[in-house]
Amino acid sequence: MWIIVTYDIGIKRNTRVRKICRKYLCHVQKSVFEGEISEKNFLKMKGELQRIVNFDDDQVAIYVFDTLRYSSKEIIGYHIDTDNVI
């Protein structure tokens, strides 16, 4: 599956959330990650995030795509190269 993760997190938890997302996805903007992820890793990442997020103050939005067949991405401005990510 392909996912996009965006977040609005309190300062104290921001670094921890970013480190978790970086383990599984490509960092494309300050609070945005995207990439291909297995179901197993998706559930692991979600569990790690749920343990950190303050449900009253923070928000993590995860957009899940089963296929990229009918999708496209347009970037206006500088482009971050994600092709070299393992």
Give the positions of each predicted feature.
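Short leucine-rich amphipathic alpha-helices used at interfaces
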Residues: 1, 13, 19-20, 46, ...
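Extended, hydrophobic alpha-helical segments
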Residues: 1-41
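Generic signature of intrinsically disordered, low-complexity segments enriched in small/polar residues
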Residues: 10, 27, 36, 45, ...
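Short, intrinsically disordered low-complexity segments
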Residues: 30, 35-59, 64
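C-terminal structural segments of small proteins and small subunits
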Residues: 51-86
